Amino acid sequence: MKQNVFFLIAYFSLVFCMCNAVSHFKNCADKQLSDDKPLQCKIRNLQVDGNMPKVKEYMNCAFESSGWAKDGGKKLDTSKVAQDMVPYGFNIKTELDEVTKECETEFGAEISSIDYLACLLIDEKTKTQFKTMLMMKEADFFKQNLCN
């Protein structure tokens, strides 16, 4: 009985923490894109690339404030990304490492957070898990009605 109570308390604590987590994507959008709702809509729908004005800087802000990237988005911290995925039921550190290495080879020295985002969302090894985690962890941003 005590064990069940402990697990219930732990579960509700985790749910409470996840619901009240800071949305780094929303904070960066509020700081950098508050006057550009059409671009926020495209980001919300993940219909962006690094050639679009403001997107590279925005994604670097979102990834760096999440703790996922360093050095202007040039280095992805797969350990931190993997750690952030665990509460959502995903344990794919090896796959994150593989996709990140392939991405760095493809984009070279000019890589940025938007490139890492694209790689993680395109590769079969990570796309479903990463997108699910992103939508849940950053729900304050991704659940907004930005497209009207």
Swiss-Prot record:
Signal peptide positions on this chain: 1-21
Keywords attached to this entry: Disulfide bond, Secreted, Signal
Cellular component per GO, a single term: extracellular region
Stated family: Belongs to the PBP/GOBP family.
InterPro entries linked: PBP_GOBP_sf
Tissue expression profile of the protein: Female salivary gland.
Listed GO MF terms: odorant binding
Source organism of the structure: Aedes aegypti
Protein function: In contrast to the related D7 salivary proteins that can bind biogenic amines, does not bind serotonin.
Subcellular location field: Secreted
Disulphide bridges: C28-C61, C41-C147, C103-C119
Name this polypeptide is given: Short form salivary protein D7S1
The keyword Disulfide bond is annotated on this UniProt entry: yes
Coiled-coil positions: none
Entry annotated with the keyword Secreted: yes
Principal location: secreted
